[in-house]
Structure formats: structure tokens, C-alpha cells
Regions:
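C-terminal cap of thioredoxin/glutaredoxin-like
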Residues: 3, 8-13, 19-35, 39, ...
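Structural alpha/beta surface segment adjacent to cysteine/selenocysteine redox centers
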Residues: 19-130
Length: 224
């Protein structure tokens, strides 16, 4: 039986996607090779200054957003969160790290490094921001992530300079829009029939996967 594909959309600056890594890890431990995550990106923090100035204008701006995130993190004791998140460092855009990560994904597809390197870099990128409060929109931070994962930045630069990483990222953003992705994180299963958005509990994701394992045919709609 082929592994069940889970198309996973996220924005690397989204704290709920950072929390959702716990669910992704649990799914991988439980199902192993029976599931396959397909990592894609959506744009939630494409222009962070505008987003915060509009969505949080009457709620304390960056200070209010910081308090909101720290309160949300209190429900996830396993998670490490820097107390000055979004205060000491304010990344301008998630597009920059997304572009870097798409270049890594292209490199994995073409055999430049292992297919698991994207996951390693993605985890490191999120940890660098949410745990260390470093600016992940800065290319110097990208170089450090690449170095820790033994990624050749010359290869990454080749995919970016050729425009291929831009094209791949544009495809992600467009497909997110076409698929009705409302935000980050979003899990899509069963060729789009099952869409799980936001702070979704592990048991809900598990129930959707179990249903597909019982009835894997794409011709038969799931009850979930």
C-alpha cells in the first residue's frame, strides 16, 4: 500500500504551526512509512509590519501580540518559547525563509542531499525564531541554518538565482489559494476532501488517517 499523502501548508512565522510540530512528530512516530508529508508554504506573514499594524492596532501592537503568543504557549508545556518573541526581533517577511526552504526542497528532489534535510532545516528555522528570537528573514541566518544541516549554500543560491525557487514558492502560494487554505497550519488529506485547519487536536488528525487506512480508495469519500 502506498503511503497516505498529507499535504501540509504552513507559514514559518506562524506560532500555531510551531506548536503543530508536536502533532506532526506524533503522526510520524505512530504511522511511520504509512504516511508521507508533502511540505508546502502559505503566506500569512508576507508583510509582518502591515499585518501587526492592522490586526493588532487596537490590541497593543507587537507587545499585545507577544502577550497573546506567550499565553497560547502556556497550553503547550513541551514547547520552548523566547519571552521576547516579536519584541527584540521582528522579521520583515516569511517569504525570505520560505524561498530558502523551497531551494532546499528542490535540492532534495534533485538528489543534492537527503530528502529529510528539508524537515531538518524547517525545524531549525522555526526553532531559531521561536526559541532563540533570531531574524529568520535575514540571509545570514539562512547561512547558519544551512551550515548546521551541512547544506551547500552554493547549491541553494543556484536554485534561487535561476528563479526556480521563486517559481516553486509561487506555485505553493497559488495552490494554497486554489485549495481554499485559510491559514497556517493546514493539513490536507484524501485529495482535498479532508482539510484540517488551525489548532487541530492529534486525535482528529488520527481519525482522518485511520479512515483512509481502512478505505484508501480515492473514489470513496471519507466520513471525516
Amino acid at each position: 500500500m502506498k503511503p497516505i499523502p498529507i499535504v501540509y501548508y504552513s507559514d514559518v512565522l506562524c506560532v500555531w504551526a510551531y506548536f503543530a510540530q508536536l502533532r506532526v512528530d506524533a503522526i510520524q512516530r505512530t504511522y511511520g512509512e504509512r504516511v508521507k508529508f508533502e511540505y508546502r508554504f502559505c503566506s500569512v506573514f508576507g508583510e509582518t509590519a502591515r499585518k501587526i499594524s492592522t490586526a493588532w492596532a487596537t490590541k497593543g501592537g507587537y507587545e499585545g501580540f507577544n502577550a497573546h503568543i506567550r499565553h497560547a504557549a502556556s497550553g503547550f508545556p513541551e514547547i520552548r518559547l523566547h519571552p521576547d518573541i516579536w519584541l527584540s526581533v521582528r522579521p520583515a517577511s516569511s517569504m525570505s525563509p520560505h524561498l530558502f526552504l523551497k531551494a532546499i526542497q528542490l535540492g532534495a528532489i534533485e538528489g543534492e542531499w537527503g530528502i529529510d534535510i528539508l524537515e531538518i532545516a524547517l525545524r531549525d528555522m522555526r526553532a531559531t525564531f521561536f526559541e532563540e528570537a533570531q531574524d529568520i528573514s535575514d540571509q545570514e541566518t539562512h547561512r547558519k541554518v544551512a551550515e548546521r544541516a551541512s547544506i551547500d549554500m552554493n547549491v541553494v543560491a543556484r536554485f534561487i538565482n535561476s528563479g526556480r525557487a521563486h517559481a516553486a514558492l509561487a506555485t505553493d502560494y497559488k495552490e494554497a489559494e486554489n485549495s481554499g487554505v485559510q491559514g497556517s497550519p493546514t493539513f490536507i488529506l484524501n485529495e482535498g476532501r479532508q482539510k484540517l485547519f488551525g489548532n487541530v487536536g492529534y486525535r482528529i488528525i488520527e481519525a482522518n488517517i485511520e479512515e483512509l487506512l481502512r478505505q484508501p480508495s480515492a473514489d470513496q469519500a471519507s466520513w471525516c
